[in-house]
A protein has these predicted regions:
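Conserved N-terminal phosphate-binding loop of PLP-dependent enzymes in the Aspartate aminotransferase
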Residues: 2-6, 10-406
Length: 406
């Protein structure tokens, strides 16, 4: 079924491309030899710089997905390219069987920046989330004294933190977690932690009600439950603060980071917590061959410095407000809702009137690359280096596209 859908998409796209387009060759080869676990927008990207990408035919696009917010610093940031070249010529991997000369520097930098005692390095966002869950369960048995094999971790409805077995098994039953459900679940004496995205990304840029995260913090304090904030997509300046939870002035017990921690150049993720949580993990109980490697550590330090020194949180706030204001002027016949924070924004398409996938394809034709989620929601999340002129230029293309469906 997925193969047929993918091929139909490609055929449909091919009719809109020039006869000399190179894209079908690359797409067909990928479909022939690669697993069909994605249904991408039919464009083949060859190079990128800053907020722009170019396809194999040389056409330029605004990147309004940023690899799901991994490229906050912009594509191929020269400072990141420089440290990658320098470190890769010196030392790339030792595994954690030995110390290396960069990892400690990275640990000190990120823990002092985000004000946690310890960091546990991993590679992908889902690895970081699973590490956080594992930490919470170990803490529940060792510190909270939950009976063995009884510890629970509560997840928000519509959560998404990856596609591993643990991630897809996280319950999103509305009867358990809707309304007063979180209160009942957190008050269970066997509950180890509550895991939540400050803004749900894959669910469609769902921004919680004011006071929600403060309420979570208060409930977790009351019932001795760990508060885990999944900042893999929302963190690192995307929403206008270094961490999204900073908007609500709350401090989670565990924070997970990924994506923009490397500026889109290398798989790097992290779990941050204080000693009373982190030190329940003993040598040999958790780890990763690549986690904390010298190359990843050097990249992460530089990626964080870029966010700070280029004032990307402030720019995300400024340009996000500008973009949201403009998006709200789009025709209501097509766009039912606009939502977001900072430069993590989305429009909700009225799918009774317009096919959202056709909107995505039309945006591509007009020079905007984005992707829909949950069918009718199109996410707009450009690199945080975008300026006012570029926001205005990109919006004119978005507006042109949306108005073509009226």
């Amino acid at each position: 079924m997925l193969s047929r859908i993918c091929r139909q998409t490609i055929r449909g796209a091919a009719t809109k491309t020039v006869p000399s387009s190179k894209a079908p060759f690359y797409i067909e080869r990928e479909l022939k030899y690669g697993a069909h676990n994605y249904a991408p927008v039919p464009v083949v990207i060859e190079r990128a710089k800053g907020i722009y990408v170019w396809d194999v035919d040389g056409k330029q696009y605004f990147d309004f997905l940023s690899a799901y917010s991994a490229v906050n610093q912009g594509h191929c940031h020269p400072r990141l390219v420089k440290v990658i070249k320098e470190q890769s010529e010196k030392l790339t991997l030792t595994a954690r069987a030995f110390h290396n000369s960069v990892f400690g520097e990275y640990c000190e930098f990120i823990t002092k920046l985000l004000k946690y005692d310890k960091v546990l390095p991993m590679n992908t966002g889902v690895e970081a989330a699973e590490t956080a869950v594992k930490l919470a369960r170990r803490w529940a048995y060792d510190v909270k004294k939950v009976p063995e094999n009884k510890a629970k971790v509560v997840f928000a409805n519509d959560n998404f933190w990856g596609r591993s077995i643990a991630a897809i098994s996280a319950s999103t039953d509305p009867d358990s977690y809707g309304g007063f459900g979180p209160f009942k679940a957190i008050s269970d004496p066997n509950t180890a932690a509550f895991h939540v995205e400050p803004i749900q990304g894959e669910a469609g840029i769902v921004v919680p009600s004011p006071g929600y995260l403060k309420g979570v913090r208060e409930l977790c304090n009351k019932y001795n439950v760990l508060f885990i904030a999944d900042e893999v997509q929302t963190g690192l300046c995307r929403t206008g603060k270094m961490l999204c939870v900073h908007h609500d002035d709350v401090r989670p017990d565990i924070v997970t980071l990924g994506k923009a921690l490397s500026g889109g150049t290398h798989p790097v993720s992290a779990v941050l917590a204080d000693d009373h949580v982190m030190l329940v993990i003993k040598p040999g109980q958790h780890g990763s061959t690549y986690g904390g490697n010298p190359l990843a550590s050097r990249i992460a330090i530089e990626a964080l410095k870029i966010l700070i020194e280029e004032n990307l949180a402030e720019n995300a706030t400024k340009q996000g407000e500008r973009l949201m204001k403009k998006l709200r002027t789009l025709p209501k016949e097509v766009v039912k809702e606009v939502r977001g924070k900072g430069l993590l924004t989305a429009i909700v398409i009225d799918k009774k009137k317009v096919d959202p996938w056709k909107v995505v394809l039309a945006l591509k034709e007009n020079g905007i690359l984005s992707k829909n989620t949950h069918g009718d929601i199109i996410r707009f999340a450009p690199p945080l280096i975008i300026n006012e002129k570029q926001i205005d230029e990109a919006f004119s293309l978005i507006e042109k596209t949306i108005k073509s469906f009226v």
